[in-house]
Amino acid sequence: MTPFLLGYFLGSLPVAYWFGALRGKDLLKEGSGNPGALNAFRLLGPVPGLLVLLLDLFKGVLAVAVGEGVSGSPLGGLLGGVGAVWGHAFSPWLLFRGGKALAPGAGVLLAVDPRLLLWALALFALLTALFRRPYRAVFGVALAMPLLAARLGKTAAHLLFGLGVGLPVAFRHLKDWNR
């Protein structure tokens, strides 16, 4: 439980929101209303947007490392990564509003196994070409994440990891289905 909670805390840190506040912008009320890297890029410019993206990616990587370090087991890393994605999507700092969790999710996948991130990106490209709607493609990748992770790790823990990472991402993208 400790790796998940530590990951949740790291993921919950609303980096984009804080960058916006430093510039006098409320990312929850401006642009898309999403406290994430893309809205930061659009409202604050490319440099702050890129910094937010990198810091959000780092939150995911760090959560996996901390989870594994605290537990002494790769399973702790999986739990820490899941916690980071849920923390970003449902941040207590923002009254449980949060980002779409793509950047920390990508960091988690990168830290767990870079092949998992590559598979997710390849599936995203394929689904984007098919649907011509990136939000639907992200939703599809999020729903496929349990199968991708289980194929990689071949364990029930990896299946549950994929479910834990995919569910909040799918949930946060559901409202954008028609975009």
Name every feature range the model reports, one short phrase each.
Residues 117-119, 134-142, 152-166:
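Loop-to-transmembrane alpha-helix initiation sites
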Residues 18-49, 98, 178-179:
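Cytosolic, membrane-interface loops and tails of multi-pass inner-membrane proteins
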Residues 16-21, 87-97, 124-131, 170-179:
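C-terminal ends of transmembrane helices
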Residues 3, 7, 12, 16, ...:
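Alpha-helical transmembrane segments in multi-pass membrane proteins
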Residues 26-36, 93-106, 133-140, 144:
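Short, non-helical or kinked segments that cap or interrupt transmembrane helices
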Residues 36, 40-44, 49-50, 54-63, ...:
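Helix-loop-helix junctions within the multi-pass membrane cores of secondary transporters/permeases
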Residues 41-44, 67-70, 87, 102-131, ...:
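Interfacial segments of multi-pass membrane proteins
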Residues 9-27, 51, 130-136:
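Alpha-helical transmembrane segments within multi-pass membrane transporters and channels
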